[in-house]
Curated annotation (Swiss-Prot):
UniProt record similarity statement: Belongs to the FBPase class 1 family.
Pathway this chain belongs to: Carbohydrate biosynthesis; gluconeogenesis
Enzyme class (EC, first level): hydrolase
Gene3D superfamilies with a match to the protein in the record: 3.40.190.80, Fructose-1,6-Bisphosphatase, subunit A, domain 1 (3.30.540.10)
HAMAP family xrefs: FBPase_class1
Gene Ontology MF annotations: fructose 1,6-bisphosphate 1-phosphatase activity; magnesium ion binding
Protein name, entry field: Fructose-1,6-bisphosphatase class 1
SUPFAM superfamilies, per the entry: Carbohydrate phosphatase
One GO term (biological process): sucrose biosynthetic process
Keyword set, alphabetical order: Carbohydrate metabolism, Cytoplasm, Hydrolase, Magnesium, Metal-binding
Length: 290
């Protein structure tokens, strides 16, 4: 893989992570391809969810992989109660080993989300994010100064494009229970559909955000506080912002930036809106003051 696009203070750690992913992504794919990979275990993770077998196997593999990095002092999986720490290193990695596990049995797109933090697990310390999606092909998307998309082919990641969102998209991925949507959100969605937007929601956050990014615009929303800040929300918020989109939530009817949020507990959750500029403007118009 050609790493010349990665520059700046945090380029080296990103390159090291990508190099490990390039070597290990086939192993990850093998874990997902096992016949019983989507079977539920009898366990409960720290968030109260019941993980599937692939969750735990992939988690173990990724934890060992990331801990092998000399400059990583802490590794934290969504499946664990607390981080695993080492004595030395400057960076911390928080990751969701298998986002979309609930739809894996239907053979939908799933993926791994990775957030790279410096010194502490805070949104303000998030310096890069990555995700890998597993489908009929494997893709890697990396956010550092810009957002780069790669496809895995013949044991290497090959550059596809730099992702920049357009002002206005054509797809929406609106997650959550619609009966609990606010009146403003319902009106915003009705307006999008009236403008011939297409609904593209799969139940896998990484897949739906990937779709918005690849199509160069649109909106992902999850208004209920269900998504975990450190492992899902912050990394994908950075991804969308670096692609010239907006990542926000509403606090008593006031639109606020997701990456300005604090973290009171490791597994704290948040509502989440990720959008290109036009969709962000429409959402603010309808949800402002609610």
């Amino acid at each position: 893989m050609d790493y010349k696009r990665f520059k700046g203070k945090h380029a080296n750690i990103v390159i090291e992570i990508i190099s490990l992913l390039e070597k290990g992504v086939k192993k990850a794919q093998e874990i997902l391809e096992k016949p019983d990979a989507g079977s539920y275990t009898q366990l409960e993770n720290s968030s109260g969810d019941t993980p599937i077998k692939a969750d735990l196997a992939l988690d173990k593999f990724l934890e060992e992989t990331f801990l092998s990095l000399e400059n990583v002092k802490s590794v934290f999986s969504e499946e664990k109660e607390t981080p695993v720490t080492k004595e030395n290193g400057s960076y911390l990695i928080a990751y969701d080993p298998l986002d979309g596990s609930s739809v894996m049995e239907a053979n939908f797109l799933v993926g791994t989300i990775i957030g790279v933090y410096e010194k502490d697990y805070k949104a303000q310390n998030l310096v890069a994010s990555l995700y890998v999606v597993f489908g009929h092909k494997i893709e890697l998307v990396v956010a550092l100064e810009e957002v780069y998309r790669y496809a895995f082919y013949q044991n290497k990641f090959h550059f596809i494009e730099t992702i920049v969102l357009e002002n206005k998209g054509k797809i929406i991925a609106s997650g959550g229970n619609q009966k609990d949507f606010s009146l403003g959100l319902k009106k915003a969605l009705e307006g999008f559909f009236a403008e011939n937007y297409r609904l593209r929601y799969s139940g896998s956050m990484v897949a739906d955000v990937h779709h918005v990014l690849v199509k160069k615009g649109g909106m992902f929303s999850y208004p209920q506080k269900k998504l975990r800040k450190l492992f899902e929300v912050f990394p994908l918020a950075l991804m969308v912002e670096k692609a010239k989109g907006e990542a926000f939530y509403f606090d008593k009817g006031v639109k606020k930036r997701l990456l300005d949020q604090s973290v009171e507990s490791y597994h704290e959750k948040s509502e989440c809106y990720l959008a290109s500029p036009h969709e962000a403007q429409i959402l603010e118009k309808h949800l402002k003051g609610e």
